């Protein structure tokens, strides 16, 4: 009996040792290392944002090449259950190849894509920073696309500057009256103390009021009450707007 017990104990220890030796250690997120997707290709999702929906993480980002910062492919999506293993879902908002009049024609700039889920419409809504092809960074537009699925395809809706003709609601009457005193011709030299003072008084808000405010680096946030916020750098990257 004693020998049988010893043999059984030895078998249990051996099996446990085999399991312990063959079990894969938990994966870690390692900053600065190449991060391959499920196809062994480096994840290509720059300036991205992550949406968590129904137990899955969706990572949206810019597809970038080594030779240009322009959009040659479009907005990519990767999905994961654990934030370490990522499946390539492809270009969920590809650039347009056969229409030179499109805002998102190949060669434009598509940056900082963020996606949220609209509970009312049951749509996935993407916002991103858009610069028109051949215009450098002068457009400074926000663009919107929607999809029925987190993995696309997303349908491009439109792009525009933010709130044309609308002043920030937190500007009081004194601040609004101050805008009439600001003459852009007096502040052609940037980064001076006088220029900074004029910026804080609303020099660029006044400059861009008619066409709408600039929107570049950006983020989306949905509060517990379902209200969504668009947070972005504006006024030539000098201030943050919400």
Regions inferred by a protein language model and the residue ranges of each:
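Bacterial Sec-dependent signal peptides at the C-terminal "C-region" and cleavage site
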Residues: 18-26
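Hydrophobic core segments of beta-strands in well-ordered, beta-rich domains
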Residues: 46-70, 90, 111-137, 145, ...
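Blade-loop segments of beta-propeller domains
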Residues: 76, 83, 87-119, 130
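Asp-box/WD-like beta-propeller blade repeats and closely related beta-sheet repeat scaffolds
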Residues: 129-222
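Short consensus segments that form the blades of beta-propeller domains
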Residues: 39, 65-71, 103-106, 132-138, ...
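Bacterial N-terminal signal peptides
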Residues: 9-17
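Conserved small/polar residues in nucleotide/adenosyl-binding loops
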Residues: 240-242
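Beta-strand initiation motifs
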Residues: 27-30, 84-88, 150-157
């Amino acid at each position: 009996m004693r020998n049988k017990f010893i043999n059984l104990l030895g078998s249990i220890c051996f099996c446990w040792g085999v399991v312990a030796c063959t079990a894969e250690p938990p994966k870690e997120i390692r900053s600065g290392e190449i991060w391959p997707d499920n196809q062994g290709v480096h994840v290509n999702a720059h300036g991205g944002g992550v949406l968590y929906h129904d137990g899955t993480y969706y990572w949206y980002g810019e597809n970038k090449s080594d030779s240009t910062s322009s959009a040659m492919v479009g907005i990519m999506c990767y999905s994961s259950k654990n934030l370490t293993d990522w499946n390539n879902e492809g270009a969920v908002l590809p650039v347009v190849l056969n229409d030179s009049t499109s805002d998102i024609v190949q060669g434009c700039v598509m940056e900082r894509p963020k996606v949220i889920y609209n509970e009312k419409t049951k749509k996935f809504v993407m916002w991103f920073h858009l610069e028109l092809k051949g215009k450098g960074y002068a457009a400074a537009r926000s663009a919107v696309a929607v999809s029925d699925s987190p993995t696309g395809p997303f349908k491009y809706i439109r792009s525009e500057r933010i709130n044309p003709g609308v002043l920030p609601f937190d500007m009081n009457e004194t601040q609004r009256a101050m805008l009439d005193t600001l003459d852009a011709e007096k502040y052609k030299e940037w980064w001076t103390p006088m220029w900074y003072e004029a910026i804080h008084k609303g020099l660029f808000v006044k400059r861009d009021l008619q066409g709408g405010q600039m929107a570049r680096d950006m983020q989306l946030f949905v509060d517990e009450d379902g209200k969504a916020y668009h947070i972005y750098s504006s006024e030539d990257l000098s201030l943050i707007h919400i």
